[in-house]
Amino acid sequence: MEPVTKWSPKQVVDWTRGLDDCLQPYVHKFEREKIDGEQLLKISHQDLEELGVTRIGHQELVLEAVDLLCALNYGLETDNMKNLVLKLRASSHNLQNYISSRRKSPAYDGNTSRKPPNEFLTSVVELIGAAKALLAWLDRAPFTGITDLSVTKNKIIQLCLDLTTAVQKDCLVAEMEDKVLNVVKVLNGICDKMMHSTTDPVMSQCACLEEVHLPNVRPGEGLGMYIKSTYDGLHVITGTTENSPADRSQKIHAGDEVIQVNRQTVVGWQLKNLVKKLRENPTGVVLLLKKRPTGSFSFTPAPLKNLRWKPPLVQTSPPPTTTQSPESTMDASLKKEKPAILDLYIPPPPAVPYSPRDENVSFSYRGHTKSKQPLPGRKGSESPNSFLDQESQRRRFTITDSDQLPGYSVGTNILPIKMRGKTPSYGKPRPLSMPADGNWMGIVDPFAKPRGHGRKGEDALCRYFSNERITPIIEESASPVYRFSRPLTERHLVRGADYIRGSRCYINSDLHSSATIPFQEEGPKKKSASSSAKASSGEPSLLVSWLTRLKLLTH
């Protein structure tokens, strides 16, 4: 590879054409000034201002790409794992010494000032830069396969985050320096541990460049490489596809960095411009790769399986049933290749409990209708959760009762039931003379004889029953002779028919307002009950109504 310092102005212009899209308007300015490779590596913010690159963000993009070229040109033969650890150790030690010497100065104002000096911030930036260079090595193969180095990498990342957070926090400079010192001490310990505990020769080996030719690429086949680009413009190969040109070459491995494509340096380029350069020559590609040292690790290519799904083979005849031992079954399963269907990602089931979708589903149960829209049939394209929606609608009609309820039926054209209008006294507060509890009635004995109704009793009832022309509550059974003994806990429940609500119920005589439990009736029974209600809903005398209520309460 030709050194960057030997580049001609044309090579510099060709390199700038692959940078970020926002930098393309400045390409002709580089061409007009005829900047060569040596001038490019020494370019600064002031030089970019003179070129017309006035925006700070655009200047930073150019300088980041130039930094990658400097690392490639000057650090290729010197950078290794050991040197990078030593650089990080030196940067952290320098920052620690700067803080200590500054605190010894008589002019130290860290306890009153909130603005750190520029030298302090510069040392922090240098420390983070050294850490990034080391992390770039730890994040590649073969170091990613070592557990200890992976843990160390995560610790360094966390310490760098703590360092940047401490510097950007609005606090006294002394507090900021205390936090930075804590981070620096931990970094020094990590560097010392890496230097003394690691004896593998891979720590001292440098990276190398290797040229790879991929000829005879068939149209539409592709190269079979998976490339990941970092935020600053490094392009790293993460794997290859089986039986692809990249895989057949046996020279492209996971962790290799793409430096040139067809003799054009692509460091710092956008990924889309790199892909365009790879497709420039359809017959073949020449790659220049930067390879990390392998050392004593078993470093082999990392092929990736084709992600296209292949359907499993259909069995025409059932396999013969033979008894096999667990050992033979395990060996056979290891020898067989895993079917492609097992590679598919199956999403997990919905969270429990399942919440049904709001759909207008009509169910008819013994004459009661919830909605008018019919239930849609199960289709092949629906998800399995659609059946759960139907089941959740069915569970709403489960009634806890001694009677066995038959199955439901789906209704399509069912007339809605006309609901009874509200009485004028609906929502009014109870009379002031009505006590809050039912203790005024005393304990009702179901085996006691009915009391006679005199004028005094009628006056007592007049205080508690309003004269609102409400249909009376008629007993279900007219013969009070046959009485069945109930448990003590059920003695205060009297079974009757509440025609105000339109259904049979259990009435608690100890309460001033009856709490009802809906009890669904048969169709014919309900029709007969409604007809009898119409017959008895004439206008009975007030005395009959009182007597009926009193007779019900005495049970």
From Swiss-Prot:
Pfam families: CNK2_3_dom, CRIC_ras_sig, PDZ, SAM_1. Residues 308-333, 348-391, 518-538 are annotated as: Disordered. Its main location: cytoplasm. PROSITE patterns: CRIC, PDZ, SAM_DOMAIN. It is a peripheral membrane protein. It comes from the Eukaryota. Residues 80-174 form the CRIC domain. Residues 311-329 have a biased composition (Low complexity). This is Connector enhancer of kinase suppressor of ras 3. It comes from Rattus norvegicus. The gene is Cnksr3.
